[in-house]
């Protein structure tokens, strides 16, 4: 069978083992070919090829539901569910999404992008099924990393107390956490766990004893302990943990043996309650470079398949904001032993991997546990440390209560660096950093800022560490502006003070963070049209520099705000509220992300779609205020405004 001809995943049913192994080969080849060309997640999907095939051998995907945790390991799922021929468009504008989307396919049963959600979703589906009296299978596939997330453990705790609710959790243990493969012993233990005698000892014996007339329907404590002991003899220690939580545990099994997994999944489906099947896989399986460097090949830009090396950019780029942050933090940690960097399993993405190597005793990785990371930092701050929490903007959403309750209300000096703030590109709606401006505005006691370039980032880091209260700064994904950087000796910025970059008489542009450089380009375009614009680098969202903004707004009564974030409750809203509260009644044009999701595309394509390029913003400003061309003036709602 050629996968390009596969019309439905149920067509896998009945294929021989040799045919299924050929399907696995085709999936790997297609996966590698596409990701090496356009980039994407590599290692996770390569590791679950056989797992996906074996699982789908035992399911009817017209009825049964599968929730893939995070979703970056679901490329094989996509290749088996009607997207093999369109897979070349992976993570491209209007192409196949890099994560799961219910709107993309009826086989994407639950959308994902963040970790640790799958068990909760699958359990919810199972309860919905039972409520309607229906009969279909509900499955969650979760990695060992995502299982460290509190939400996953909460769901396991709940499901374990529902012994009559069938639910299958597949633990994809890719040898990065929990427990390594244990070879022949694990195979023996698994065969014993599935054998009829062990099923009798661990299950049927209880039912038999309960019906003895002198037992009164209850199992004596002594027999309960004996039953528990027999279970623990039959499974590894990690299995005993899940058994104690109310799950039937099966495994560990070889995650690249289709036959063994198929038999195990079939046995799991026959159970009438929650079951956890522990599958040991090799991340990057089938591509030696990815197997050897499982962290580096988790996700990749375009690369040469024959060498595994990234295809170099056509021209050199300045260092990324993440790298500048990481290198600067090393210096600050070396100068002050009380500074500690904290990450929630994203060291490489945030630049903290540099700190881990250079100053390991001032580095903490809490795993996928954003809530814990924030409150851990709060506790450290109580004891005189200066914690720096480096986290993606989209992931800090997961710890909003802790921001308010544990840091903000107590006014603790915790510094947050929000990486990937703004438009991130190909990862799509679940990863866009478009909400942090809005949600941080409301948190008590916080000082919130964003640099116009990487040099100002260094100054803001010093500002945060010297400030006796909670702080947050946002940095965009990708390269900096290429400005000259200082190795040390950075000076703190005055809190709440912006910067006037250029003066003009026709309008004032107030730009925040990554929009400062585009604002300057926009002002230059306006000047070419005969219009002069003042440009303010706001620097601070909270507190806003009213002393700079208000006089200019009174003198030049046309205000434009620019931000790379959602307009709802955003930076522009803060400026508008400030002007209104001080009776400065001038027209304000807010430019940013409207009330919509930003789908996967390149960052430039997304900005063009949102009207955030300098050319688009220049035209929008002229049209809004009736400045510049006659056509723009005729379409303006503010023709009567006097400069």
Swiss-Prot record:
Q: What does this protein do?
A: Catalyzes the acyloin condensation reaction between C atoms 2 and 3 of pyruvate and glyceraldehyde 3-phosphate to yield 1-deoxy-D-xylulose-5-phosphate (DXP).
Q: Indicate the quaternary assembly.
A: Homodimer.
Q: Where does Mg(2+) bind?
A: 144, 174
Enzyme class per UniProt:
transferase
Residues annotated as binding thiamine diphosphate are 72, 113-115, 145-146, 174, 287, 370
Cofactor mode of binding and number, as noted: Binds 1 Mg(2+) ion per subunit.
Q: Which reaction does it catalyse?
A: D-glyceraldehyde 3-phosphate + pyruvate + H(+) = 1-deoxy-D-xylulose 5-phosphate + CO2
Q: What is this protein called?
A: 1-deoxy-D-xylulose-5-phosphate synthase
Q: Which organism is it from?
A: Synechococcus sp. (strain CC9902)
Write down the PANTHER family for this protein, in alphabetical order: 1-D-DEOXYXYLULOSE 5-PHOSPHATE SYNTHASE-RELATED, 1-DEOXY-D-XYLULOSE-5-PHOSPHATE SYNTHASE, CHLOROPLASTIC
Gene Ontology molecular function: 1-deoxy-D-xylulose-5-phosphate synthase activity; magnesium ion binding; thiamine pyrophosphate binding
UniProt EC number: 2.2.1.7
Biological process according to GO? 1-deoxy-D-xylulose 5-phosphate biosynthetic process; isopentenyl diphosphate biosynthetic process, methylerythritol 4-phosphate pathway; terpenoid biosynthetic process; thiamine biosynthetic process
Cofactor(s) needed for function: Mg(2+); thiamine diphosphate
Q: Which GO terms describe its cellular component?
A: cytosol
Superkingdom of this entry's organism?
Answer: Bacteria
Recorded hits in CDD domains, A to Z, give: TPP_DXS, TPP_PYR_DXS_TK_like
InterPro entries, per this entry? Dxylulose-5-P_synthase (IPR005477), THDP-binding (IPR029061), Transketo_C/PFOR_II (IPR009014), Transketolase-like_Pyr-bd (IPR005475), Transketolase_BS (IPR020826), Transketolase_C (IPR033248), Transketolase_CS (IPR049557)
Q: Which UniProt keywords apply?
A: Isoprene biosynthesis, Magnesium, Metal-binding, Thiamine biosynthesis, Thiamine pyrophosphate, Transferase
The pathway it acts in is: Metabolic intermediate biosynthesis; 1-deoxy-D-xylulose 5-phosphate biosynthesis; 1-deoxy-D-xylulose 5-phosphate from D-glyceraldehyde 3-phosphate and pyruvate: step 1/1
Database matches in Pfam families? DXP_synthase_N, Transket_pyr, Transketolase_C
Q: Which family does it belong to?
A: Belongs to the transketolase family. DXPS subfamily.
**Coiled coil regions, renumbered to chain:** none
């Amino acid at each position: 069978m050629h996968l390009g001809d596969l019309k439905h995943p149920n067509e896998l049913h009945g294929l021989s083992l040799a045919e299924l192994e050929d399907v696995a080969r085709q999936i790997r080849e297609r996966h590698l070919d596409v990701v090496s060309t356009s980039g994407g997640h590599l290692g996770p999907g390569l590791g679950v090829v056989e797992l996906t095939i074996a699982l789908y051998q035992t399911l009817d995907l017209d009825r049964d539901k599968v929730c893939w945790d995070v979703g970056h390991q679901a490329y094989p799922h996509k290749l088996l569910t009607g997207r093999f021929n369109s897979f070349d468009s992976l993570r491209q504008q209007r192409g196949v999404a890099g994560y799961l989307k219910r709107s993309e396919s009826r086989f994407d049963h639950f959308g994902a992008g963040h970790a640790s959600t799958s068990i909760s979703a699958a359990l919810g589906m199972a309860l919905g099924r039972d409520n309607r009296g229906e009969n279909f299978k509900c499955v969650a596939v979760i990695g060992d990393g995502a299982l460290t997330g509190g939400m996953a453990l909460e769901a396991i705790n709940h499901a374990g107390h529902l012994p009559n609710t069938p639910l299958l959790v597949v633990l994809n243990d890719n040898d990065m956490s929990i427990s390594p493969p244990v070879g022949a012993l694990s195979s023996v233990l698994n065969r014993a766990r599935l054998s009829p005698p062990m099923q009798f000892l661990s299950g049927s014996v209880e039912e038999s004893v309960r019906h003895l007339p002198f037992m009164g329907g209850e199992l004596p404590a002594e027999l309960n302990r004996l039953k528990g002991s027999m279970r623990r003899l039959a499974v590894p220690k990690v299995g005993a943990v899940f058994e104690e939580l109310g799950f039937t545990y099966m495994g560990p099994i070889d995650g690249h043996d289709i036959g063994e997994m198929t038999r195990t999944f079939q046995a799991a489906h026959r159970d009438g309650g929650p079951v956890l099947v522990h599958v040991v896989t090799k991340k990057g399986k089938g591509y030696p470079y990815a197997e050897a460097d499982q962290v580096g090949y988790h996700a990749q830009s375009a690369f040469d398949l024959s060498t595994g090396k990234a295809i170099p950019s056509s021209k050199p780029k300045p260092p990324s904001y993440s790298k500048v942050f990481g290198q600067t933090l090393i210096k600050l940690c070396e100068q002050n032993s009380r500074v500690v960097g904290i990450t929630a399993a994203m060291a490489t993405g945030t630049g903290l991997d540099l700190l881990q190597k250079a100053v390991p005793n001032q580095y903490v990785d809490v795993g996928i546990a954003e809530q814990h990371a924030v409150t851990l930092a709060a506790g450290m701050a109580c004891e005189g440390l200066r914690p720096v929490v480096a986290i993606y903007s989209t992931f800090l959403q997961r710890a909003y209560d802790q921001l308010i309750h544990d840091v903000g209300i107590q006014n603790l000096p915790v510094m947050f660096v929000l990486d990937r703030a703004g438009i991130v590109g190909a990862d799509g709606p679940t990863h866009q950093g478009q909400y942090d401006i809005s949600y941080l505005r409301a948190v008590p006691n916080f000082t919130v800022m964003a640099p116009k370039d990487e040099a100002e980032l260094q100054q803001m880091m010093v500002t945060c560490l010297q400030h006796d209260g909670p702080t947050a700064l946002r940095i965009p994904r990708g390269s900096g502006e290429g400005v000259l950087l200082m190795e040390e000796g950075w000076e703190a910025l005055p809190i709440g003070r912006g910067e006037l970059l250029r003066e003009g008489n026709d309008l004032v542009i107030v730009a925040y963070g990554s929009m400062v450089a585009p604002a300057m380009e926009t002002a230059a375009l306006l000047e070419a049209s005969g219009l002069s614009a003042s440009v303010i680098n706001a620097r601070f969202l909270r507190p806003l520099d009213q002393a700079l903004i208000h006089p200019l707004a009174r003198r030049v009564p046309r205000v434009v705000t620019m931000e790379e974030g959602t307009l709802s409750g955003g930076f522009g809203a803060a400026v508008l509220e400030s002007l209104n509260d001080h009776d400065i009644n001038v027209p304000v044009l807010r430019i940013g992300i409207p009330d919509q999701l930003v789908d996967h595309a390149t960052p430039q394509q997304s900005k063009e779609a949102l009207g955030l390029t300098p050319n688009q913003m220049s035209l929008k400003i002229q049209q809004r205020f009736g400045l510049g061309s006659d056509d723009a003036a005729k379409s303006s709602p503010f023709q009567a405004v006097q400069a």
